């Protein structure tokens, strides 16, 4: 073969790859252009952090890369709340294989790393969908790039591209579905097993929806299978089981930790409910429909206006048999119904109702719709020109009806009008195509492709890739690093082994500790220990289904949580409770006067008599102080007046003040003190005690709400004598640390009076406790914290954490992998024997 022939061969190979390459590059280019237009860093000062990407993913990614670079254990993290199992958190949020490339990323550019991965996944969606079309329909038509772009820039991706823990599954879904087709039709299992196992390992939650879809789609394939149906069922069950089992190394630890979270429990709906009418739902396939991420269940199902046209032509196409059409159209209709029906919605979402971010399976609806539309495109010659007119009339009627019965706040008139314009444009182009020569048809295809990609681009620009200020997110990082380093230096001068927690007065997220690398008592995570949230709420602190926060804690409770330092973005008022110890720029570090070590003794009587479930937050804290020896109420009521829009406290004595309030509709309360101080209390609807700070006699404290409603305030003054007494009772017997690491703690304690050694560590299955070298079954204090009964005398204490279920899961995963390899070997040997037998004949 001469050089010319070699060059021609290479050229042909590149030509064959061009549609797939275009399916990747077109979404990539569009996403980059939109980022430039939206002034995303480095093209401006914006970034793509949205919703959970802002509050969870960036902090968790930062903690992940810190652990990888420092060599710390991947089993446990102390920077996430009071401490958290990291294997389950990794499985839930970070398990994408692509995330390991974060090792190449400088720490200060984690945001950009996540943004690049977001854009990469969008582009890979286009590639894998185009690859599916190429293999499924045995075509390399350039149109696969256009349809791949439609999948990549769908409304689901516009709404949820920021949700980087989900999008690997969107990339893999076309390959998994192609794999199940190969499994049934060609008896090939490798693609199905590898892609499904990878999806399950990457994100079990979205994989549940893929698995439900696979079962339904498999039934269609089985109906179309003429012979070997039993074998197909066996293969599908066997390799699905192996794929699921391969994910056990992460699934089992994740399931155990989720069992202790706010996501535990299944409550199937008792009655059928329809969320909305189907016309309003399907109207969300129009262009410029605002993506929806709230709690009203609206799915994001736009995939291009052209699909509204092609799906009708699919129904009238004479080149596609009704035996093929009927089950696929029924599946599409079933999926559309699933968005509107509460029971089906519950099943699709893994036997849970989503807490916002609805219709999480809608990418599968978009997948199926685009596949049917592509098949229509391939068989356009089997349609007639008048079918276009019928489709035009039906689409017009649909638009009118959907507009009539849709919520104008969700789908505006501009959306319907623009959709109508595009429908007319596509109708005209199709009519020209039907009446044109082969050359004219080529031009029509080119023009239509440009129109489709333009439509998708404009919609994605208008509804996707929202931004926030990068500057405001990162501006304090260096100052935080400086003051935290000074805190470490101060502690290391006093002791070789130390433990303390730090909190912020003005936090960006409830996971700021993971962002800046310090230990805290606040977190926001779906894997959060729900018992900690419950005790926080019982004490008048901030807590919910997937978060708990130090807001509302008195100095006594803060001390029990080992909260030693407070970071403030502005200088705080003078107070006997804390001292300024460091500053950097506009960031200030204060040391609390009251802070206990990680472990401290509590009398049996206190643990037994403290009834923290039946009172309010203030009374429960007062009761604890009383049980610890306080002779007076720690938080005593002082006069306050409440009227519409404002509550007022006239300060008659120097002291530290708090306030509790009735229910409020405003999400923010503002404190104004007559000395000029101001403070904002966000998430006021969570109902926590307000820390009003130190005030002097004669000061006036006003608490205002933006909704101009009457909020009944009960004000309290902190009794320092009661606080001192309660604190000294706990501080009189504490554990001295001798070593501390991510998953192992050792210490000694000299117990003067038998009782319970309580740790400010959430009680979870992974902890093993040793007292004087003997394993001891840990108990629970306040239903949330690790507690160990101790007799009087000196004791050596050791706590070791091992992720529960990790070893069992690893063994199951390894076993399933071996079984797959053995199955593949056996299958290969069978095929070889068949070939040999045929050659002998």
Give the ranges of each region predicted by the language model.
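Active-site-proximal, structured, solvent-exposed surfaces of multi-pass membrane proteins
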Residues: 8-12, 631-841
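Hydrophobic alpha-helical membrane-insertion signals
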Residues: 11-85, 468-485, 493-510, 514
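Membrane-embedded helix bundles of polyisoprenyl
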Residues: 27-30, 118-136, 141-224, 235-260, ...
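Membrane-interface coil-to-helix junctions
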Residues: 28-129, 149-170, 209, 258-263, ...
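Periplasmic/ER-lumenal interhelical loops and adjacent helix-loop junctions
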Residues: 51, 55-66, 97, 232-327, ...
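Transmembrane alpha-helical segments
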Residues: 125-133, 172-184, 212-220, 308-315, ...
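Contiguous transmembrane helix-bundle modules in multi-pass membrane proteins
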Residues: 183, 187, 206, 326-346, ...
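Extracytoplasmic/lumenal acceptor-recognition loop(s) of multi-pass membrane glycoenzymes
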Residues: 451-474, 488-560, 594-596, 601-626, ...
């Amino acid at each position: 073969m001469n050089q010319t022939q070699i060059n021609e061969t290479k050229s042909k190979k590149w030509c064959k790859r061009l549609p797939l390459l275009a399916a990747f590059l077109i979404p990539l280019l569009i996403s980059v252009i939109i980022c430039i237009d939206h002034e995303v860093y480095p093209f401006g000062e914006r970034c793509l952090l949205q919703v959970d990407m802002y509050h969870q993913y960036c902090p968790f990614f930062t903690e992940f890369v810190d652990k990888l670079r420092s060599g710390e254990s991947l089993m446990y993290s102390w920077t996430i709340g009071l401490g958290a199992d990291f294997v389950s958190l990794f499985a839930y949020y970070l398990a994408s294989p692509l995330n390991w490339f974060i090792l190449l990323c400088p720490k200060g550019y984690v945001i950009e790393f996540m943004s690049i991965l977001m854009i990469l996944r969008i582009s890979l969606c286009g590639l894998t969908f185009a690859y599916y079309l190429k293999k499924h329909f045995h075509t390399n038509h350039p149109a696969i790039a256009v349809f791949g772009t439609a999948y990549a820039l769908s409304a689901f991706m516009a709404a949820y591209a920021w949700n980087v823990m989900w999008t690997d599954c969107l990339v893999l879904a076309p390959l998994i579905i192609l794999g199940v087709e190969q499994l049934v039709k060609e008896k090939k299992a490798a693609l199905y097993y590898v892609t499904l196992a990878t999806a399950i390992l990457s994100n079990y939650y979205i994989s549940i929806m893929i698995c439900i879809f696979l079962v339904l789609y498999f039934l269609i394939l089985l109906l179309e299978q003429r012979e070997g149906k039993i074998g197909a069922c066996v293969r599908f069950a066997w390799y699905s089981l192996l794929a699921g089992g391969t994910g056990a190394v992460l699934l089992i630890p994740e399931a155990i930790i989720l069992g202790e979270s706010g996501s535990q429990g299944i409550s199937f709906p008792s009655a059928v409910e329809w969320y909305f009418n189907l016309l309003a739902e399907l109207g969300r396939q129009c262009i410029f429909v605002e993506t929806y991420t709230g709690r009203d269940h609206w799915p994001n199902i736009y995939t291009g206006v052209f699909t509204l046209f092609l799906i009708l032509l699919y129904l009238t196409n004479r080149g596609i048999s009704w035996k093929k059409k009927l089950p696929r159209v029924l599946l599409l209709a079933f999926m559309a119904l699933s968005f509107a029906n509460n029971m089906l919605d519950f099943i699709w979402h893994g036997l849970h109702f989503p807490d916002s971010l609805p219709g999480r399976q809608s990418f599968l609806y978009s997948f199926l719709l685009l596949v049917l539309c592509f098949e229509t495109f391939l068989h356009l010659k089997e349609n007639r020109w008048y079918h276009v007119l019928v489709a035009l009339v039906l689409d017009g009627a649909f638009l009118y009806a959907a507009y009539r019965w849709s919520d104008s706040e969700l789908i505006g008139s501009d959306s319907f009008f623009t959709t109508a314009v595009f429908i007319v444009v596509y109708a005209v182009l199709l009519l020209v195509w039907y009446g044109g020569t082969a050359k004219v048809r080529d031009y029509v295809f080119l023009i239509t492709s440009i129109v489709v990609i333009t439509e998708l681009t404009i919609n994605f620009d208008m509804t996707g890739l929202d931004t926030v200020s990068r500057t405001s997110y990162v501006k304090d990082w260096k100052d935080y690093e400086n003051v935290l380093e000074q805190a470490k230096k101060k502690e290391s001068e006093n002791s070789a082994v130390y433990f303390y927690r730090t909190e912020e007065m003005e936090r960006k997220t409830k996971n700021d500790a993971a962002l800046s690398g310090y230990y805290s008592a606040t977190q926001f995570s779906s894997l959060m220990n729900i018992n900690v949230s419950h005790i926080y709420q019982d004490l008048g602190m901030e807590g919910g289904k997937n978060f708990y926060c130090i807001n509302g804690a008195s100095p006594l409770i803060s001390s029990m949580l080992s909260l030693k330092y407070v970071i403030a973005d502005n200088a705080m008022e003078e107070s006997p409770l804390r001292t300024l110890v460091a500053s950097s720029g506009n960031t200030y570090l204060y040391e609390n006067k009251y802070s206990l070590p990680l472990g401290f003794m509590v009398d049996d009587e206190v643990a037994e008599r403290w009834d923290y479930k039946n009172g309010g937050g203030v009374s429960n804290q007062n009761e604890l102080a009383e049980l610890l020896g306080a002779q007076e109420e720690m938080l005593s009521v002082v006069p306050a007046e409440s009227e519409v829009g404002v509550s007022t406290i006239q300060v008659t004595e120097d002291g530290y003040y708090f306030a509790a309030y009735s229910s409020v509709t405003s999400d923010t309360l503002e404190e104004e003190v007559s000395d000029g101080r101001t403070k904002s209390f966000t998430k006021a609807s969570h109902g926590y005690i307000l820390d009003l700070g130190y005030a002097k006699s004669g000061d006036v404290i006003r608490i205002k709400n933006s909704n101009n409603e009457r909020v009944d305030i009960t004000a309290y003054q902190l009794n320092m004598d009661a606080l001192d007494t309660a604190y000294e009772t706990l501080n009189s017997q504490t554990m001295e640390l001798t070593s501390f690491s991510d998953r192992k703690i050792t210490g000694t304690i000299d117990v003067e009076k038998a009782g319970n050694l309580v740790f400010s560590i959430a009680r979870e299955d992974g902890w093993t406790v040793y007292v004087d070298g003997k394993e001891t079954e840990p108990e629970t204090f306040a239903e949330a914290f690790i507690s160990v009964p101790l007799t009087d005398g000196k004791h050596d204490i050791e706590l070791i954490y091992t992720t529960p279920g990790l070893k069992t899961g690893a063994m199951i995963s390894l076993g399933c992998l071996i079984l797959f390899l053995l199955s593949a070997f056996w299958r290969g040997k069978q095929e070889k024997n068949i070939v040999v037998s045929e050659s002998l004949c």
